[in-house]
Curated annotation (Swiss-Prot):
UniProt GO cellular component terms: CCR4-NOT core complex; nucleus; P-body
Family: Belongs to the CCR4/nocturin family.
Species assigned in the record: Phaeosphaeria nodorum (strain SN15 / ATCC MYA-4574 / FGSC 10173) (Glume blotch fungus)
Localization terms from the record: Cytoplasm; Nucleus
Keywords: Cytoplasm, Exonuclease, Hydrolase, Leucine-rich repeat, Magnesium, Metal-binding, Nuclease, Nucleus, Repeat, RNA-binding, Transcription, Transcription regulation
GO MF: 3'-5'-RNA exonuclease activity; metal ion binding; poly(A)-specific ribonuclease activity; RNA binding
Protein name: CCR4-Not complex 3'-5'-exoribonuclease subunit Ccr4
PANTHER family found in the cross-reference section: CARBON CATABOLITE REPRESSOR PROTEIN 4 (PTHR12121), POLY(A)-SPECIFIC RIBONUCLEASE (PTHR12121:SF100)
Length: 597
């Protein structure tokens, strides 16, 4: 058996490619190309040894688990086709060997194997690789030695963790081969990433109508929530699959502004917006589209010098100035609130787990200038770490407790005395036209209790629909023994349970939630929500999911079309009618006398 000959002629590779493909590059051998030749020769030797022992006709190995992961070896089976079922049903695989077969085509479903770290396609008859190969961002080794590849897809640029791309033995264009020879795999992948045109722009997201608005006089309100990915967090090391030009803040902020202008929501809640971007860019730019805003940075900014503090991200609420007047605004500092609660004094979990987090919530109290309806608008960014479900729950409990206290206070707020819009020089739109303020101001509405005031609560809650955070907000209560709290001690929260007085619902629950709101290679799921009070508002329209066909070749965001790793949520509501009497006497101030003259 040791003297057995390989089952293909020595002068030709198994796929019929002459050995001259290996030796015909008339250049000095470099370190990188020497590695290509060595690894290619190793691959051929392994196949030859298996041929000599008759292993090429053995049954294909089923999925096996080793200390390094799960793998399937279909090498040397003379396979001409691989069914897509393998890729779809075995998405858990970390290694896949399809080398030394007779494959001429690789199905696009290969993109389903997003856990792969090692893929060997050597010694086949492949003439091309599908663009979906770029979805395999966990790949460390991609071996395509000794095929018939005449080019490589630009989507390989997404494979930022790739350590070895084995291309020797293919009629690859000289410019690509030159980069590999002189600079190696890492630089070739970078070349693809930085020069790729990227995917075609996706279709516009569908607008989903849940209920028709039949009365043109019906009061409506639209809200948009968006984690815009702070510039400080948007690094090449974190988002290595994205071209550097698409990560640049100057590029991303223009895309973000473009979406905000396109949606034209009455209320906009942004998370991960830093102080500098709020003051120097968004506040000024959005003022041209009738927006005013409030902002607070995360609590660590208080201890920093001004130059560092302006780079700290936080939460901002923008609102249409011609439609709403700001009655009050409040900051909810979770850590500071927690350590100052009498029932939590001495609780070690507060000091060890909650206090070190600087996450915040921002709450605004608005009034519709024309109808007198009032709104509580909350915007929050909850702690991110999946291992701290208890901290997330405590933060949201403090948020809801704070909103409840503010709501009680605001239910007793006096009527707004002057709701005529004041116009500023930067309040005109880009064409120099003034905002439309034709509606006459109406009397302020009264609310008997805080829970009667319409609530819109936006944010990145970093919590899935199966979480305790979701349960608390939608059900209004959770038990002190909830699994997300574990065995931690958080004062009354873990003694008596947690509750709030509002009747809240996720806007997107009407369609079973979004497919995802956060889209990165290692996670695609729902973390962001717009909640609304069902006793005062009815959701009638939603901005739908991103096109699935587009996503088939996009391993993660951000990219040239989506400037954040989160997507914007956008919803429309009608304000339900109320029987409460309106305040009969309203003082609109000096402006009323001016109108009479």
């Amino acid at each position: 058996m040791s003297n057995a000959q390989p089952h293909f002629a020595p002068s030709h590779l198994q796929n019929g490619t002459p050995n001259s493909v290996h030796s015909g590059v008339n250049r000095p051998t470099t370190e990188h190309w020497a590695e290509q030749r060595t690894r290619s020769a190793d691959s051929t030797k392994r196949r030859t040894r298996k041929s000599a022992t008759g292993q090429q006709h053995s049954e294909p190995r089923t999925a096996r688990t080793t200390s390094r992961g799960q793998y399937v070896d279909f090498g040397g089976q003379n396979l001409k086709v691989i069914t897509p079922t393998l890729f779809i049903n075995y998405s858990f695989l970390t290694k896949l060997y399809l080398n030394a077969n007779k494959l001429t085509y690789l199905h696009q479903a290969i993109g389903q194997l997003r856990n792969l770290t090692h893929l060997d396609l050597s010694l086949n008859n492949l003439h091309s690789l599908p663009p979906e190969i770029g979805m395999l961002v966990n790949l460390k080794q991609l071996l395509v030695f000794d095929n018939q590849l005449t080019d490589l897809p630009e989507e390989l640029g997404s494979l930022y963790q790739l350590e070895l791309l084995g291309i020797e033995g293919n009629p690859i264009p000289d410019d690509i081969k030159q980069i590999m020879m002189e600079q190696g795999t890492v630089e070739l992948i970078k070349h693809f990433r930085e020069t790729a045109a990227g995917p075609e722009a996706p279709p516009e997201r569908d607008w989903i109508v849940l209920d028709e608005i039949t009365d043109p006089a019906q009061e409506t309100v639209t809200a948009l929530s968006y984690n815009i990915l702070c510039d400080k967090y948007c690094t090449q090391s974190q988002y290595g699959y994205t071209p550097s030009s698409a990560l640049a803040w100057e590029t991303r902020r223009e895309l973000i502004l473009g979406e905000l202008k396109q949606r034209n929501a009455d209320i906009v809640c942004l998370q991960e917006i830093d102080q500098d971007s709020f003051n120097e860019y968004f506040r000024e730019k959005l003022a041209h589209y009738d927006y005013k805003g409030v902002f607070w940075p995360k609590s660590r900014a208080r201890t920093m010098a001004e130059r560092e503090a302006k780079l700290v991200d936080g939460c901002a609420i923008f609102y249409k100035n011609s439609k709403y007047v700001l009655l009050d605004k409040q900051l909810i500092d979770f850590a500071n609130t927690a350590i100052n609660r009498p029932d939590m004094k001495g609780e070690h979990d507060i000091f060890n787990r909650v206090m070190p987090r600087d996450d915040i919530g921002v709450v605004a109290f608005l009034e519709n200038r024309a109808t007198g309806s009032r709104f509580i608008v909350g915007n929050v960014h909850v702690f991110w770490n999946p291992a701290f479900t208890d901290v997330k729950l405590v933060q949201v409990a403090i948020l809801m407790e704070g909103i409840s206290k503010f709501a009680t206070k605001w239910s007793k707020f006096p009527p707004c005395k002057d709701k005529v819009v004041y116009r500023f020089t930067n309040g005109d739109d880009e064409d120099g036209k003034e905002a439309d303020t034709t509606q006459e101001p109406g009397p302020s509405k009264e609310y008997g209790a805080g829970a009667d005031i319409p609530v819109i609560l936006c944010g990145d809650f970093n919590s899935m629909p199966s979480s305790g955070v979701y349960d608390l907000i939608t059900q209004g209560t959770i038990a002190h023994s909830h699994q997300d709290l574990g065995s931690r001690k958080y004062g009354n929260f873990t003694r008596d349970g947690i509750s709030h007085p509002f009747s809240l619902k996720s806007s997107y629950s009407a369609i079973g939630e979004m497919t995802f709101t956060n889209y990165v290679p290692h996670f695609q799921g729902v973390l962001d929500y717009i909640w609304y009070s069902t006793n005062t508002l009815q959701v009638v329209g939603l901005l739908g999911d991103i096109d699935k066909e587009y996503l088939r070749r996009v391993p993660g965001f951000p990219n040239y079309h989506f400037p954040s790793d989160h997507v914007a949520l956008y919803a429309q509501y009608i304000v339900k009618g109320r029987k409460e009497k309106k305040v009969s006497e309203v003082d609109f101030g000096p402006s009323r006398d001016r109108e009479r003259r």
